[in-house]
């Protein structure tokens, strides 16, 4: 049942000048249950002191005080204006967390002037006056308020507000919301953090201190705003400031960023020493805590507020925004405005990797005891997430998928994640803001996840799944089985796709042509890193066949003597050919100066699929004299990266270097073998005998 209250406010004309000289006004409070109420008897006076200004329509925000020692039971109060007319009001409860903690209430009073209507006005001072009524003791009075209340004095109709009343949270907070989060205005939860704003530096310092005490964490400033010229760009929202229909400008060039003491280590003399020690001891990448505090100072202009009702047409809101911007640009210097400090504070669950291995560094502080609901929420999240992360499970799975495909660059992964979230996870109207770290992780978060996935792949905890490879990279056999072999890839010119290529040994081999479409999906890094023909060690497929890998992107970058098993072959990147061998009974290694060495005497003729080329030697000569058995020294060209290409044919796959155009024409006109081929065949006959 809604109660109607009244307060009688009377002023003694004889003492009016003296009261105004002292800057206070005296009002009266009457009990409607008193039998003398409404009669000529003087009412009982309760002192309420409030400062008054002489150039404002209303008084400023200063606490007023009511005193009483006895609680009233069901009394009603009436509020009277200076003319003795009653003013009705409704007792309403504040819908924010601060009001729930303090038990404060708010009184809504109709907009009617108390003071003289001819008094001067100032837009910057036309804000509601909140009159706090706290219970005090008065031995001579029998009246008082049962619970504290906040009386809001009226303002003149049509005037804009500079300081809007304490707004309700953007979304209802759960019962397990931390106390430090309840102190933020318009608080909302974003992932593992809470965001709100403060209206003064004192309030900001109080919230930060309370947060550090409850979470028992230590923070260091990573970034602070620079003393640049004042910002003039008008904005409605940003990475740190949510949209609330009020335009603003940034009060600093950058936001304040604070990192946990277990966060990333920064540049410095000590860091160089530590990096050298870790490089000597071959330490792997160490994950660091991703928890951060963000503080952004802005200047808001509430008098240019636009409606935020979602039922209003967007075109109308857009027109209102343009009109507000136009007016604000003209009066930006005289617009005034209010300052706000938007703060985003992480919870205890946002802290990770606090295990310390460095001597002399204090161990991770014990976490602040959580409520049962917080513990239950943390347990559920740990069960649902494969990796310890504050990221959304689908985002974490996407990182694992990208790393399994070979994408290890941090910024490449971040680009793919943003596309995944904005195009696949959410509709265009439901995309979360970029500051939601659950869907838009930081670079440090991505580094930690890449490290965890790579470690799991090495240890075998995460099995490589070929089903997540793009279809353009999947090669299968005739039966449809996916092959995981690495194959020889050689760029050649002078032959059409599918055209039979005669070999130097006089046998015609049918070439299996591969269209260049699969190459478009290769990372460009592969072709820039492989400057020469590089061959992997032989790998055995399930059916016993052997395969090699060879990638060459530029013919000019190849060694000057790059040849095939017999003669010279020009290598280019016009086509990709995969050939089948007709039992070449040699295993030959080539040096840079075209020297060849045969080891056919050690390979029996019964071996079905000997490899024509095993390794390419660069800058080294074959030392036959030092090897009594005649074996050949083989050297890899640095680090070789495997390419996840699948074989279409299940038969053995070998390298078939193509010939240049001139050589093809010469061999088509001259069926006889060259002297080099004859020499090769003679060596083969001798080894067979």
UniProtKB/Swiss-Prot annotation:
Region: Disordered, residue numbers: 1-46, 541-609
Keywords carried by this UniProt record: Activator, DNA-binding, Nucleus, Transcription, Transcription regulation
> Quick one: signal sequence residues?
none
Locate the compositionally biased regions of type Basic and acidic residues.
Answer: 13-29
Is this entry keyworded Manganese? no
GO molecular function ontology, one term from the record = DNA-binding transcription activator activity, RNA polymerase II-specific
For biological process, the GO terms are:
cellular response to calcium ion; positive regulation of transcription by RNA polymerase II
Bias regions of kind Polar residues — which residues? Answer: 541-559, 578-601
| Annotated InterPro entries | CaRF
Record's Pfam families?
ALS2CR8
Q: Which compartment or compartments is the protein found in?
A: Nucleus
UniProt GO cellular component terms: granular component; nucleus
Q: In which tissues is it expressed?
A: Highly expressed in brain and testis.
Q: What does this protein do?
A: Acts as a transcriptional activator that mediates the calcium- and neuron-selective induction of BDNF exon III transcription. Binds to the consensus calcium-response element CaRE1 5'-CTATTTCGAG-3' sequence.
Q: What is known of its domains?
A: The N-terminus is necessary for DNA-binding. The C-terminus is necessary for transcriptional activation.
Q: What is this protein called?
A: Calcium-responsive transcription factor
Source organism (scientific name): Mus musculus (Mouse)
Q: Which gene encodes it?
A: Carf
């Amino acid at each position: 049942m809604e109660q109607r209250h009244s307060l009688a406010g009377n002023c003694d004309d004889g003492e009016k000048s003296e009261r105004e000289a002292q800057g206070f006004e005296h009002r009266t409070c009457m009990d409607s249950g008193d039998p003398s109420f409404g009669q000529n008897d003087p009412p009982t006076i309760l002192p309420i002191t409030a400062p008054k200004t002489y150039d404002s329509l209303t008084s400023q925000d200063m606490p007023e005080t009511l005193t009483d020692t006895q609680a009233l039971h069901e009394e009603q109060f009436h509020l009277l204006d200076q003319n003795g007319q009653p003013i009705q009001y409704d007792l309403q409860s504040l819908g924010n967390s601060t009001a729930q903690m303090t038990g404060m209430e708010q009184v809504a009073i109709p907009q009617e002037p108390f003071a003289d209507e001819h008094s001067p006005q100032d837009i910057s001072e036309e804000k509601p006056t909140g009159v706090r009524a706290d219970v005090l003791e008065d031995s001579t009075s029998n009246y008082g308020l049962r619970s504290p209340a906040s009386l809001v004095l009226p303002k003149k109709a049509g005037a804009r507000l500079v300081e809007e009343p304490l707004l309700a949270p953007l979304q209802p907070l759960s019962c397990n919301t931390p106390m430090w989060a309840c102190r933020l205005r318009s608080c909302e939860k974003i992932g593992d953090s809470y965001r709100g704003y403060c209206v003064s530096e004192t309030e900001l310092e109080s919230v930060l201190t309370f947060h550090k005490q409850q979470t028992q964490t230590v923070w260091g400033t990573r970034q602070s705003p620079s003393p640049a010229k004042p910002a003039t760009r008008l904005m409605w929202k940003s990475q740190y400031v949510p949209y609330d229909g009020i335009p603003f400008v940034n009060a600093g060039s950058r936001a304040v960023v604070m990192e946990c003491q277990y966060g990333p280590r920064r540049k410095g003399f000590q860091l160089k020493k530590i990096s050298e020690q870790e490089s000597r001891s071959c330490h792997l990448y160490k994950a660091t805590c991703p928890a951060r505090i963000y503080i952004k100072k802005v200047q808001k202009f509430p008098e240019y507020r636009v409606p935020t009702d979602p039922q209003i047409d967007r075109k109308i809101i857009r027109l209102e925004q343009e009109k507000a911007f136009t007016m604000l640009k003209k009066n930006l210097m005289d617009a005034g405005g209010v300052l706000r400090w938007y703060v985003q504070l992480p919870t205890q669950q946002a802290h990770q990797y606090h295990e310390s291995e460095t001597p002399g560094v204090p161990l991770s502080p014990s976490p602040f005891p959580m409520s049962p609901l917080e513990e239950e929420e943390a347990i559920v999240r740990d069960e649902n997430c494969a990796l310890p992360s504050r990221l959304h499970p689908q985002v974490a799975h996407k990182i694992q998928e990208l790393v399994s495909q070979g994408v290890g660059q941090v910024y490449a992964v971040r680009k793919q994640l943003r596309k995944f979230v904005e195009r696949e996870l959410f509709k265009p109207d439901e995309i979360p803001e970029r500051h939601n770290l659950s869907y838009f992780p930081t670079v440090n978060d991505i580094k930690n996840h890449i490290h965890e996935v790579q470690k799991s792949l090495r240890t075998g905890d995460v099995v490589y799944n070929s089903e997540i490879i793009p279809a353009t990279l999947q090669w299968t056999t005739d039966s449809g089985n996916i092959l995981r072999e690495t194959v020889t890839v050689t760029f050649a010119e002078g032959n059409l796709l599918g055209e039979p290529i005669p070999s130097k040994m006089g046998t015609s081999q049918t070439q299996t042509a591969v269209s260049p479409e699969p190459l478009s999906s290769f990372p460009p890094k592969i072709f820039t890193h492989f400057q020469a023909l590089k061959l992997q060690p032989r790998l055995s497929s399930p059916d016993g066949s052997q395969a090699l890998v060879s990638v060459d992107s530029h013919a000019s970058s190849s060694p000057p003597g790059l040849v095939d098993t017999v003669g010279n072959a020009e290598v280019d990147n016009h086509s990709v050919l995969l050939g089948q061998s007709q039992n070449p009974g040699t295993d030959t290694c080539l040096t840079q100066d075209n020297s060849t060495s045969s080891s056919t005497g050690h390979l029996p003729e019964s071996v079905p699929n000997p490899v024509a080329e095993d390794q390419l030697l660069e800058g080294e000569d074959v030392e036959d004299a030092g090897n009594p058995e005649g074996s050949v020294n083989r050297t890899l060209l640095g680090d070789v990266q495997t390419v996840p290409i699948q074989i279409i044919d299940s038969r053995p796959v070998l390298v078939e270097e193509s010939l240049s155009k001139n050589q093809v024409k010469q061999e088509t006109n001259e069926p006889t073998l060259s002297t080099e081929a004859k020499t090769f065949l003679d060596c083969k006959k001798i080894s067979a005998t």
